Amino acid sequence: MSKDIPTPYMWSYQPQMGLAAGASQDYSSRMNWLSAGPHMIGRVNGIRATRNQILLEQAALTSTPRRQLNPPSWPAAQVYQENPAPTTVLLPRDAEAEVQMTNSGAQLAGGARHVRFRDRPSPYSSGSIKRLIIRGRGIQLNDEVVSSSTGPRPDGVFQLGGAGRSSFTPRQAYLTLQSSSSQPRSGGIGTLQFVEEFVPSVYFNPFSGAPGLYPDDFIPNYDAVSESVDGYD
């Protein structure tokens, strides 16, 4: 096997902290070529070299440029801010009140806010302007003949002012609330961002340099939280 074609380091995810727990070489992905001839060995090395090149290009495309490969806390500017799903609330209904209003031919149409204007009910003087009070009844807009009687309809159907549907619908009414975070989240990252940020690392000639230059993240017993290697000072 050519030493110039290393086996990639596979990152593991720490879900409680949202960090990478470390990386180790995945020897299970290596092809068995011990009984192969020189031609087969060359083809195997070609496949491994192509795989490493693809991983390097993928890391360059999806990884965020940062000084520290595996930071213990990600700033909010580099963390994917997921939008929470909207909250749906079932609106309460008073079936008994709806039936009573329908039977009595009640009409709901608009509303007014009571405002006082310095000891008088309106901003205009009652003597200068004659107010015309208009009273009316809602009508049902359908294919039936509109009744001109002043009393409630015999079928108890009434019109909600400003709406095209009469009476109360038996269907339930829901209120959808869009929830959003008031402050961007920082700290750990999610699984989707982890897959994009921590592509299997290709570390060339891992054992050819000084021991102090070897990345701590590639040591199996490395602790990403304390940034130390278990068993070493």
Curated annotation (Swiss-Prot):
According to the lineage, what is the superkingdom?
Viruses
Question: Which is one GO molecular function term here?
Answer: hexon binding
Q: Which UniProt keywords apply?
A: Capsid protein, Host nucleus, Late protein, Phosphoprotein, Virion
Residue numbers covered by the propeptide annotation in the UniProt entry = 112-163
Q: Name one GO cellular component term.
A: host cell nucleus
Q: What induces it?
A: Expressed in the late phase of the viral replicative cycle.
Where are the Phosphoserine modifications?
180
In the record, which positions carry Phosphothreonine?
64
**Which residue numbers mark the site Cleavage?**
111-112, 163-164
Q: Which Pfam families match?
A: Adeno_PVIII
- Report what the Swiss-Prot or TrEMBL entry states about this protein's PTMs: Cleaved by the viral protease during virion maturation. May cause the middle segment to be shed from the capsid.
Family under the similarity heading: Belongs to the adenoviridae hexon-linking protein family.
The annotated subunit structure for this chain is: Interacts with the peripentonal hexons as well as the hexons in the facets. Part of a complex composed of the core-capsid bridging protein, the endosome lysis protein VI and the hexon-linking protein VIII; these interactions bridge the virus core to the capsid.
Q: What else is known?
A: All late proteins expressed from the major late promoter are produced by alternative splicing and alternative polyadenylation of the same gene giving rise to non-overlapping ORFs. A leader sequence is present in the N-terminus of all these mRNAs and is recognized by the viral shutoff protein to provide expression although conventional translation via ribosome scanning from the cap has been shut off in the host cell.
The identity of this protein, by name, is Pre-hexon-linking protein VIII
